[in-house]
Amino acid sequence: MNTILAQQIAKEGGVEAWMIAQQHKSLLRFLTCGSVDDGKSTLIGRLLHDTRQIYEDQLSSLHNDSKRHGTQGEKLDLALLVDGLQAEREQGITIDVAYRYFSTEKRKFIIADTPGHEQYTRNMATGASTCDLAILLIDARKGVLDQTRRHSFISTLLGIKHLVVAINKMDLVDYREETFARIREDYLTFAERLPGDLDIRFVPLSALEGDNVAAQSANMRWYSGPTLLEVLETVDIQRVVDRQPMRFPVQYVNRPNLDFRGYVGTLASGSIKVGERIKVLPSGVESSVSRIVTFDGDREEAYAGEAITLVLNDEIDISRGDLLLAANEALAPAQYAAIDVVWMAEQPLTPGQSYDVKLAGKKTRARVETIRYQIDINNLTQRDVESLPLNGIGLVEMAFDEPLALDIYQQNPVTGGLIFIDRLSNITVGAGMVREPVERGVTPPMEYSAFELELNALVRRHFPHWNARDLLGDKHGAA
């Protein structure tokens, strides 16, 4: 057993008491990102090593791996704790998003180590989508690079408000204060163009030597701020979903017997109480909450992030993908939206293409109307393009096959975030963040292939009880 873990269990008075204490610790999800070889994996390895989260067999294996794959000579190559794929170890880079877990006496942590190479930007965006804080590593010898700007922009685009700029490899510049000050000034100048109200902090460190990671550095006495670990343990994460109106996307309908009908899901934002009046979108039907059922029994109130089952006082038609919200909310379903897109497929995104989209349990179809612009995230400028390439980021207007209840992503990532799915391969090809619903006039009918129209006609003729919608709509009447 890990020595520090054994000490913590003994201090709490046994395994059960220790597990209860762990449940009540706050959780911080953060990612490390930056340019290639800035030391992201080494930093995570240093955090795990200095907080004594490594077991004896792992340490022994690390010694052996450092001799075979290491890049630090006779020293331990702490990056190998994270770079688990064989290709990563052979090339000395990170390719996939690697997740690691550790805890201190003050907090629990989930780390996402993301790749630095530009061709793996989609992997980095995936890692950032669930994080509260981003550590942006900068090589003290190189300063702010294009990839640093790229990752900073993607992090803020995905709603991360807390940025820790870790200026790494200070040992290679003789721990000079002027180097730290120059890079800090350069980054702040760039950050003025980043969207949102950001909390930006700077820490000079050496992941390889351990300076200012978990303990204060004797080599940088000019720096009086907190260590990186102290920042992570004390940063106040204000979740935006706690302050937003109630949203409850229905994951599925639970009907184990004739006497029970509950709607299961995770409360995306806000809170809900027994007796509260609710409205169902897109139907607009209203009811009230009679029970809030959880794994631990019935509750009088539930909060954002909790998995619950809602029982209503009325028997109304609710299915997977519907959205429950407060009855007095004025949210109207939208059929058009402007969406920030991170494109993840080799085949570029072009106007006129149709995809399946999935948003908070709701799956429907959408068409690309126009690409307003692509963002050059090296200098945050906008340029007109005819298509959005792999790893491209741009603002796109989409038309949905049916009206959807949408929130702005920066206010509610669950009901404002969606994925694009290729209808033939079923592969996720893009991620979208709703910028704003778009007002349009009469909705034009979606264009369908001859095969889809024929299949729709066959289904309606031979399976009328399925209640399939006529894809041609009013065109029959017009004809």
UniProtKB/Swiss-Prot annotation:
Enzyme class: transferase
GO biological process, one term: hydrogen sulfide biosynthetic process
SS bond list: none
Residue segments, region G4: 168-171
Pathway(s): Sulfur metabolism; hydrogen sulfide biosynthesis; sulfite from sulfate: step 1/3
Amino acids binding GTP: 34-41, 113-117, 168-171
InterPro entries registered for this protein in UniProt: CysN_GTP-bd, CysN_II, CysN_NoDQ_III, G_TR_CS, GTP-eEF1A_C, P-loop_NTPase, Small_GTP-bd, SO4_adenylTrfase_lsu
Region (G3): 113-116
Alphabetical keyword list: ATP-binding, GTP-binding, Nucleotide-binding, Nucleotidyltransferase, Transferase
Region annotation G2: where it falls in the sequence: 92-96
Self-association and partners: Heterodimer composed of CysD, the smaller subunit, and CysN.
UniProt function note: With CysD forms the ATP sulfurylase (ATPS) that catalyzes the adenylation of sulfate producing adenosine 5'-phosphosulfate (APS) and diphosphate, the first enzymatic step in sulfur assimilation pathway. APS synthesis involves the formation of a high-energy phosphoric-sulfuric acid anhydride bond driven by GTP hydrolysis by CysN coupled to ATP hydrolysis by CysD.
Name of this protein: Sulfate adenylyltransferase subunit 1
Source organism phylogeny: Bacteria, Pseudomonadati, Pseudomonadota, Gammaproteobacteria, Enterobacterales
Gene name per UniProt: cysN
